[in-house]
Every structure is written in structure tokens, then in C-alpha cells.
């Protein structure tokens, strides 16, 4: 029994060492960053969702993922904000981790997603 408990504790500890979360940012703070043009905002939703409406100025990850580096600024400290559908959606992680892999260090997650953005009655932009 002690070995089982030790094994479980080790597994939990190892899992927490590799867990990675990006700091959350509220929809109103994202809107402020969008208006000030101080961040790159990445929509990690499907192309259809992006076309239906996204945060103004947001880039579609589906459209840029194969050449992400060309879509991001040279300054690796630039604020990168990734979002997807709602707090239960994990699609944003692909975009956030891709930016992190390119060396970006200031990455945040709008966990409310486009659903929370819409609930807050913030403006959206139709996609292309």
C-alpha cells in the first residue's frame, strides 16, 4: 500500500511539473489591448467560427499556423493573446504553445473565449 501511495504521489508530482498554464486576461483587457494595438490576438477557433465573428484584429490561427513566425512581430516580449470558444475549450493551447516555441514570453489566455466576449456584448469583426 505504501508503494502504491508513493507511486501515485510521484505521478501527480511529475504531472504538475509538466503542467503549463498561461495567465488569464479578461475580455475588457483584451479590448483595451486591441484598441491600443499593443498585442497580437490569435483566434484558435475553427475557420467557420472565425468567419462568424472574432475579436477585432484577431488573426485566425488556422490560417497562419503554418507560417506563424511571419505573422508575429520580431519583439519576443510582445503581448500575445490566444483564445478559443469558452472556458472549457483547450484549442487556444496550440496557438499559445506555438508562440512560446518561437520564443515569445508574454503570452496570455482569454479563458472566457469568444463566448464570454459575446456575453460581455463586446464588438466582433466578421472574418474572411
Which residue stretches match the model-derived regions?
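Short, glycine/acidic-enriched loop or turn micro-motifs at the edges of active sites
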Residues: 46
Amino acid at each position: 500500500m505504501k508503494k502504491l501511495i508513493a507511486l501515485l504521489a510521484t505521478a501527480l508530482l511529475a504531472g504538475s511539473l509538466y503542467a503549463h498554464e498561461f495567465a488569464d486576461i479578461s475580455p475588457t483587457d483584451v479590448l483595451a489591448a486591441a484598441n491600443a494595438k499593443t498585442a497580437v490576438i490569435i483566434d484558435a477557433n475553427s475557420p467557420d467560427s472565425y468567419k462568424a465573428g472574432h475579436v477585432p484584429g484577431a488573426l485566425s490561427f488556422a490560417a497562419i499556423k503554418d507560417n506563424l513566425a511571419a505573422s508575429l512581430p520580431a519583439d519576443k516580449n510582445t503581448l500575445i493573446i490566444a483564445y478559443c470558444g469558452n472556458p472549457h475549450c483547450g484549442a487556444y493551447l496550440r496557438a499559445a504553445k506555438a508562440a512560446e516555441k518561437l520564443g515569445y514570453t508574454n503570452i496570455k489566455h482569454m479563458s472566457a473565449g469568444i463566448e464570454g466576449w459575446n456575453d460581455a456584448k463586446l464588438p466582433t469583426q466578421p472574418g474572411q
